[in-house]
């Protein structure tokens, strides 16, 4: 069962919110890697989930950059 954020939910966020989520996820990944190195990690699956979430965020940002998808505030500008 996936516990990460679905891509559809990420597509509803603004770019600022995506960048904030990306920063938070990267910080969490750093902490998880530190826990793994010190032998304190209790949930190895979380490491993979966070990496996948980071990839999803990058994918949504890239889709917007290429014009394949528009953000939620793009429709209000017209």
From Swiss-Prot:
GO terms for biological process: translation. GO terms for cellular component: cytosolic large ribosomal subunit. One of its GO terms (molecular function) is structural constituent of ribosome. Keywords: Ribonucleoprotein, Ribosomal protein. Gene3D superfamilies: 1.10.287.310. It holds the Pfam family Ribosomal_L29. It comes from the Bacteria. PANTHER family: 60S RIBOSOMAL PROTEIN L35/50S RIBOSOMAL PROTEIN L29 (PTHR10916), LARGE RIBOSOMAL SUBUNIT PROTEIN UL29C (PTHR10916:SF0). Belongs to the universal ribosomal protein uL29 family. This is Large ribosomal subunit protein uL29. The gene is rpmC.
């Amino acid at each position: 069962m996936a516990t990460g954020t679905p891509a559809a939910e990420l597509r509803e966020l603004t770019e600022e919110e995506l960048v904030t989520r990306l920063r938070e996820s990267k910080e969490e990944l750093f902490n998880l890697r530190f826990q793994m190195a010190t032998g304190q990690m209790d949930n190895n699956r979380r490491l993979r989930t966070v990496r996948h979430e980071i990839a999803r965020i990058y994918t949504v940002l890239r889709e917007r950059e290429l014009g394949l998808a528009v953000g939620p505030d793009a429709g209000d500008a017209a």
